[in-house]
Amino acid sequence: FQPSLVLDTAKILLDNYTFPESLMG
């Protein structure tokens, strides 16, 4: 179990989730 891996995955998921919102304004 690697906490850093989980944090990186969570960050990627959050980035992918918020990107369309920021793109739409």
Swiss-Prot record:
Keywords: Extracellular matrix, Secreted, Transport, Vitamin A
Gene Ontology cellular component terms for the protein in this record: extracellular region; interphotoreceptor matrix
Superkingdom classification of source: Eukaryota
GO molecular function, one term: retinal binding
Location of this chain's protein in the cell: Secreted, Extracellular space, Extracellular matrix, Interphotoreceptor matrix
Coiled-coil stretches: none
UniProt keyword annotation of Secreted present: yes
Keyword Plastid: no
Primary location group: secreted
Function: IRBP shuttles 11-cis and all trans retinoids between the retinol isomerase in the pigment epithelium and the visual pigments in the photoreceptor cells of the retina.
Protein name: Retinol-binding protein 3
Organism: Sus scrofa (Pig)
Name of the gene this protein is made from: RBP3
